[in-house]
């Protein structure tokens, strides 16, 4: 399977705690993907997908937050990641699959 070509399947997203935007993101991700493993490190959350795919939809985060948030605004609270990134105007995708990025 192509997702395993790199030898890495899981991907992780690091979100700094303390903002409504981060909490809204966490809430949306928990609702949309129950397979995610969320570790609370006190000042940040490490969100890991054992399936190799995390997608953050800014429209969903905006709905949860109650105000519109753009990808560029959201990137300020996203501290780091482990995996490959693809962005669209309203979406942040983290994947372990190189070929997925080439299909977009």
What positions do the PLM features span?
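Intrinsically disordered, low-complexity boundary segments flanking structured domains
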Residues: 1-3, 33-34, 78-82
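Short, surface-exposed ligand-recognition loops at beta-strand->loop->(often short) alpha-helix junctions
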Residues: 13-21
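Helix-rich interaction surfaces within compact, conserved domain-sized segments
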Residues: 41-44, 50-104
């Amino acid at each position: 399977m192509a997702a395993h070509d790199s030898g890495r399947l899981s991907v992780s997203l690091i979100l700094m705690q303390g903002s409504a935007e981060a909490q809204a993101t966490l809430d949306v991700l928990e609702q949309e993907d129950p397979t995610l493993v969320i570790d609370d490190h006190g000042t940040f959350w490490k969100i890991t997908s054992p399936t190799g795919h995390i997608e953050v939809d800014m429209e969903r985060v905006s709905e949860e937050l109650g105000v519109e948030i753009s990808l560029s605004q959201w990137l300020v609270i996203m501290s780091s990641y482990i995996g490959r990134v693809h962005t669209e105007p309203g979406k942040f995708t983290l994947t372990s699959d190189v070929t997925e990025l080439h299909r977009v």
